[in-house]
Swiss-Prot record:
HAMAP family: MenG_UbiE_methyltr. Belongs to the class I-like SAM-binding methyltransferase superfamily. MenG/UbiE family. The keyword Transferase applies. The gene is menG. One of its GO terms (molecular function) is demethylmenaquinone methyltransferase activity. Its EC number is 2.1.1.163. It comes from Anoxybacillus flavithermus (strain DSM 21510 / WK1). SUPFAM superfamilies: S-adenosyl-L-methionine-dependent methyltransferases. It catalyses: a 2-demethylmenaquinol + S-adenosyl-L-methionine = a menaquinol + S-adenosyl-L-homocysteine + H(+). This is Demethylmenaquinone methyltransferase. S-adenosyl-L-methionine binds at residues 58, 79, 106-107.
Length: 237
């Protein structure tokens, strides 16, 4: 019987959790750290605020948010892979954070009330969900009026020549790295499939607007290999 996208993604991340951080660095040549740092700068996270990291995985962005809001703030990380969360829990424990809560849950139906968070993020997770718009609307729902919702994700490079190299890298080399470093050729084949099928920057910006966000900002990284989308939930909504 053919697996649904959600079932396949869940199986992938349950299997690669122990190698995920290392492979992230290998695949992106460690650029994902710089991309997230720049995104955080643009978010201008304030002390004492409340944030949610959707599809938090091993909690790297969750931890960055926790450092930004400080001990007077509050941060939640949510993921549907218990194995990924276990890795994240160890990181949170090592840092002694008392204001971070990791939650096992589904991005398609966030277990939080409306208008709860000042910041809602999703990093390299939106491409893996069954329905992009459903998740964007859920993030919109739980954001406070005036809150910021941010997606950092792979994108579709527009530079001629570089785009072809990018697709060749994702299709052939990345799964090979997965086989060498994580013994998971099939799983990393899935990651390149999801990246290839994900909307480009302009299309995703339009989806943000359709979900209700205003003042949508887009920042491409490394010739469009990745992109940040930042939207605001209107005041009074």
């Amino acid at each position: 019987m053919q697996q649904s996208k959600e079932e396949r993604v869940h199986r992938v991340f349950e299997k690669i959790s122990d190698h995920y951080d290392r492979m992230n660095s290998v695949i992106s040549f460690k650029r994902h750290v710089a991309w997230r740092k720049d995104t955080m700068k643009r978010m201008n996270v304030q002390k004492g605020t409340k944030a949610l990291d959707v599809c938090c995985g091993t909690a790297d962005w969750t931890i960055a948010l926790a450092e930004a809001v400080g001990p007077s703030g509050e941060v939640y990380g949510l993921d549907f892979s218990r194995n990924m969360l276990k890795v994240g829990e160890e990181k949170v424990k090592e840092r002694g954070f008392q204001h971070v809560t990791l939650v096992h849950g589904n991005a398609m139906s966030l277990p939080f009330p409306d208008n709860t968070f000042d910041y809602v993020t999703i990093g390299f997770g939106l491409r893996n969900v069954p329905d992009y718009m459903t998740v964007l609307k859920e993030m919109y729902r739980v954001a406070k009026p005036g809150g910021k919702v941010v997606c950092l994700e792979t994108s579709q490079p527009t530079l001629i020549g570089f785009r072809q190299l990018y697709y060749a890298y994702f299709r052939y080399i990345m799964p090979f790295f997965g086989k060498i470093f994580a013994k998971s050729y099939e799983e990393y084949s899935w990651l390149q499939e999801s990246a290839r099928e994900f909307p480009g920057m302009d299309e995703l910006a339009d989806m943000f607007r359709q979900a209700g966000f205003v003042n949508v900002q887009v920042k491409p990284y490394t010739f469009g290999v990745a992109a940040m989308h930042l939207g605001h939930k209107p005041d009074g909504r």
